[in-house]
Amino acid sequence: MGTVHARSLDPLPMNGPDFGSPDDADLVEVEPEKKQEILENKDVVVQRVHFEGLGRTKDDLIAHEIGQVFKAKNLIEVMRKSHEAREKLLRLGVFRNVEVLIDTSEGEDAVPNGLDVTFEVTELRRLTGSYNTMVGNNEGSMVLGLKFPNLFGRAEKMTFQFSYGTKETSYGLSFFKPQVGNFERNFSVNLYKVTGQFPWSSLRETDRGVSAEINFPIWKTSHTLKWEGVWRELGCLARTASFAIREESGHTLKSSLSHTMVIDSRNASILPKRGALLKINQELAGYTGGDVSFLKEDFELQLNKQLAWDSVLSTSLWGGMLVPVGDRPSSIADRFYLGGPTSVRGFSMYSIGPQSEGDYLGGEAYWAGGVHLYTPLPFRPGRGGFGDLFRTHFFLNAGNLCNLNYGEGPRAHLQRLAECIRWSYGAGLVLRLGNIARLELNYCIPMGVQSGDRICDGVQFGAGIRFL
């Protein structure tokens, strides 16, 4: 997207006593390797940094992103730190393009080893629009958006987004504000309305809400603190909905505080080859208002190890628990769901666990684990190109979803979670869609099927971002 250009501090003369005449130039041996070494190790000073193309972007925002350039001591460091500064500027989301030019200093105050660095930038327009498609957990959607980037000159942005999907329709307005000099620290506010259809539960849900969140890093972890207030309207999706679903119909008001911690050392979010992910989330509802009260904990763990022949062994573990607070039972909208091509394969979407007349009610506790082996395609067709997006996939999944009696002790809870384990195994193909999503086509053999579970024995297709 951009290039770092640099001029030599000491250009090689083309004639003169140091080089010879043009006639005998072919008798002189030039050693570019030594010249390059001298150039790399020569001490330099960055005297000035110029910006061309700035409009509404504030100077203090820019100054924090390019400060390290002045600390460079040689040409290689100048080029490296200039490239890092360019990446930081692009990450702000206020420039369409950033180019870097490194040149020798000129002017009366120029020193012999002085350098000037120039960033040529192109700012985004005040209003931009977008149209794209997105892939969620076994759901596709069309997304229309309007964005006001760099609203006040310090990388703020306001976004309006409308999404129409196969199971969900939503629109929302959000405002994003990063901390100057520390983009990972940011604040955002969201207003939204989401209408979703959940055929596995014969349920329709409409959420109208507002949320505010703060994101910040601590050492190698990233944290999110969030408050959310949402008015939820639940209704029956079909006239044949069970009585248990009809009992859940109506309006509830949830006000909750949540905290999420993430440690991610993976080399990629989609089909990583190495690294680990740990994500822990806690949510407490009811103490800041509303008529829904609960404590909810869940986690996600993933480990990836690269093996011989470009194969990858991946293991993952999910788990969670929902504890109602007070006399009111938990809502179907807050419980966990399990099953489908993105979790325990070989079972239909969210069709494991408690159910009533064919409508799945979710559970207050669950766990799920998986072991996966990803290998290149046999005989490596399309190696180095399109073929590298495909992987063969061998998997073993297991999990359970249930309700707990919180009057019992932890031993009884663990025993309940260890009963009636559903598991499956199989093989298939995986297609990586950039670093955005992945598609799976697997042949699944479900095992440990319990009464009421809905299975998908044979070929199963899955699309999404988060997979077990």
Swiss-Prot record:
Region (Disordered): 1-25
POTRA domain ranges (all copies): 44-124
InterPro entries with a match to the protein in the record: Bac_surfAg_D15 (IPR000184), D15-like (IPR039910), POTRA (IPR034746)
Alphabetical list of Pfam families matching this protein: Omp85 (PF01103)
Keywords, comma-separated and alphabetical: Membrane, Mitochondrion, Mitochondrion outer membrane, Transmembrane, Transmembrane beta strand
UniProt GO cellular component terms: mitochondrial outer membrane
GO biological process: cristae formation; mitochondrial respiratory chain complex assembly; protein insertion into mitochondrial outer membrane
Compartments where found: Mitochondrion outer membrane
Membrane topology: Multi-pass membrane protein
Tree of life domain: Eukaryota
Free-text comment on this protein's domains from its UniProt entry: Its C-terminal part seems to contain many membrane-spanning sided beta-sheets, that have the potential to adopt a transmembrane beta-barrel type structure.
Its job: May play a role in the maintenance of the structure of mitochondrial cristae.
Protein family per UniProt: Belongs to the SAM50/omp85 family.
Assembly notes: Associates with the mitochondrial contact site and cristae organizing system (MICOS) complex (also known as MINOS or MitOS complex).
Protein name as annotated: Sorting and assembly machinery component 50 homolog B
